[in-house]
């Protein structure tokens, strides 16, 4: 049996982060870190060896989730799935300029989250070096 997929969760709303982390654990994933800012997301993604990063787009502070994802992708081949309640045209364009592994709208629908994670993980495993 494969070990559970390791996830870095990036969410700046504490209650939402706890809820999503709980849902991920119930689905059998291992949440290795919860980041609340872009710089923290980068640090955890590069030091906690996640299989995937679940990234809220709208974060407090100067760096949003798209900028954080760019930094992560420039340093490591880790798939990033974006999460957001609202994405305007400019943000959509910025997302498309990254190698997004998926998008999950808020409020999070658990089957959609699980299916998106599975697609991202299977695609990443087929691309990663052996």
Predicted regions and their residues:
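Acidic catalytic/metal-coordinating carboxylates
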Residues: 37, 63-67
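Active-site residues of response regulator receiver
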Residues: 56-57, 84
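His-Asp phosphorelay/catalytic-motif detector in bacterial-type signaling
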Residues: 3-4, 49-51, 74-81
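Two-component/phosphorelay signaling modules centered on CheY-like receiver
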Residues: 13-33
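Short amphipathic alpha-helix used as the core "switch/output" element in two-component signaling
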Residues: 43, 66-78
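C-terminal output helix
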Residues: 90, 108-119, 125
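Acidic, metal-coordinating helix/loop segments flanking the phosphotransfer/catalytic sites
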Residues: 21, 34-52
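Alpha4 helix (beta4-alpha4-beta5 surface) of REC/receiver domains from two-component response regulators
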Residues: 81, 87-105, 115
């Amino acid at each position: 049996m494969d070990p559970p997929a390791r996830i870095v969760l990036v969410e700046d709303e504490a209650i939402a982060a706890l809820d999503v982390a709980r849902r991920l654990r119930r689905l059998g994933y291992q949440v290795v870190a919860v980041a609340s800012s872009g710089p923290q997301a980068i640090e955890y993604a590069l030091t906690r060896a996640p299989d995937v990063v679940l990234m809220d787009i709208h974060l407090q502070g100067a760096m949003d989730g798209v900028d954080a994802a760019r930094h992560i992708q420039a340093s490591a081949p880790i798939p990033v799935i974006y999460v957001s309640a609202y994405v305007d045209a400019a943000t959509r364009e910025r997302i498309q300029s990254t190698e997004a592994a998926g998008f999950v709208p808020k409020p999070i629908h658990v089957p959609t989250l699980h299916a998106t994670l599975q697609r991202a993980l299977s695609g990443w495993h087929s691309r990663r070096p052996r």
